[in-house]
Amino acid sequence: MDLTKRFNKQLDKIQVSLIRQFDQAISEIPGVLRLTLGEPDFTTPDHVKEAAKRAIDQNQSYYTGMSGLMTLRQAASDFVREKYQLDYNPENEILVTIGATEALSATLTAILEEGDKVLLPAPAYPGYEPIVNLVGAEIVEIDTTENGFVLTPEMLEKAILEQGDKLKAVILNYPANPTGITYSREQLEALADVLRKYEVFVVCDEVYSELTYTGENHVSLGTMLRDQAIIINGLSKSHAMTGWRLGFIFAPANFTAQLIKSHQYLVTAANTMAQHAAVEALTAGKNDAEPMKKEYIQRRDYIIEKMTNLGFEIIKPDGAFYIFAKIPVGYNQDSFAFLKDFAHKKAVAFIPGAAFGQYGEGYVRLSYAASMEIIREAMKRLEEYMREA
């Protein structure tokens, strides 16, 4: 009996990611330096770890409510109010999730139906499309490569009008993976002026909100589009807590009343001990990202200088911890082939730009969430490779 033909047909649209394919292609290279990971190289702050230990010792190992601990929702409410001037009631406008990924899954499965369209500025994080596809909806990419990876009001409105009534949502990720771009208040207000004219959800993936390098705090669209915005955030990037799997949904009460249904039946509730640690992270550790940011800026600037001198075109990223660089003219523009050859010859791994959609081809993404020692050696090997190619 072969039951594989009875799986959800939408799974046929989902393939193993190019990131995983590339990782497999270089997996047998000994001692490869990986500037590939989308997670901080820092460790979770000690005081946060101690809070989790206390919770374990106090037998705080039972289910919490579906929305999460009230103390954590209050801490999250206070945190986003102080940092980003967002106003969400901890009683009924905040859901604690198993990372930002579950927050996205719960949100997109709740708002989308078969045949719906979702706009996404591209190049983009590849994790959105599989979720959208699973419910029978479709991602429509907006090419931003000719505008410094920034979505303009004109580009947005044109795309909205082209999709018509089938458009259900717009996803905005900023600071962005893979490009590192972010938006000023003025840019966001211009986008908000367009979005509020249309009955669409605005899903804001703001998981890198604590990692901005302009000297200004992150600005959330939730301050401008409260009746449309669903804000996704988490602690993975801000507090080096990727493995703790702790995220949040911030949305109006009439939204969370629906979103909690998909959240509940996906996971029941987030990890209890991790929630206690998160309370500590958002209170005593509310500024824990600051020392990390200083390190990231030094690493970013070093890489930009080295790669620019080698002919790569780079839009300076103002957030996250990625460089998205255009492969110089005269070299193989097939990003997978270019980086596979580089990895096999010099034992350094970046991520092919093609992993981030059709508009990422011809680019490479590297993460500066790695030590300066590794980064210096990687840049030295890249210089050798470019000279020898």
Task: Show which residues each predicted segment covers.
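PLP-dependent class I/II
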Residues: 1-7, 12-15, 20, 25-33, ...
